[in-house]
Amino acid sequence: MTTYWERLASRLPAGGSAALVTSPHNRRYLTGFPSSDGCVLILPDAAYFLTDFRYIEAARRQIRSMECLCYQRLTDTLRELTEKHGVRRLLVEAGQMTLRERRKLRETLSGDVEDGDELDDWLEALRLIKSPDELRRIREAQALTAYGFEKILDYIRPGRTEREIALELEFLIRRQGA
């Protein structure tokens, strides 16, 4: 099965291109791992999840599709990896880095750092096409929602607060596996 990062890597232009994904929602999409810190470096033939000491152990347990590395200084780790893999062009998500972060990245890396909409467009296109597993999970979530709605209708009565109804609904769907 092709992983999400491999689908993204297949869009990279030949000749030393890589992508750096930093937004929390796209990091989670590519890795399946929720965290408030980290980034994903996508190369044509490899991918790395880079994070700090707070998340590295959990990341290594949960992320199987790419290598997880702990950094002390992100720019140093990125420089080492981009040099090792011969990266001459690094695409970053538009609007995800401060000007200072982008400037520091450009000063640290030997190749070009590009922050146009190209990477954002690729990520959006990948997320639009659902995998069989994503479709299965969407169907399961929809079935749980329908079940909860059907059952909660019997519980709703005058005098019940929204909070009571919300708690009962949560209990109903959690009992079913949500």
Regions found by a protein language model. Name each.
Residues 67-69:
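A short acidic, glycine-rich active-site loop
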Residues 73-178:
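Flexible, acidic/His-enriched mid-domain "rim/lid" segments that flank
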Residues 1-49, 56, 75-79, 83-86, ...:
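Terminal domain-start leader segments
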Residues 22-24, 51-53, 72, 92-97:
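Structural motif
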Residues 58-65:
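A short, polar/proline- and glycine-enriched secondary-structure boundary/capping micro-motif
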Residues 34-36, 64, 104-107:
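Short, glycine/charged-enriched secondary-structure capping and boundary segments
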Residues 55-58, 101:
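Short, charged N-terminal beta->alpha structural module
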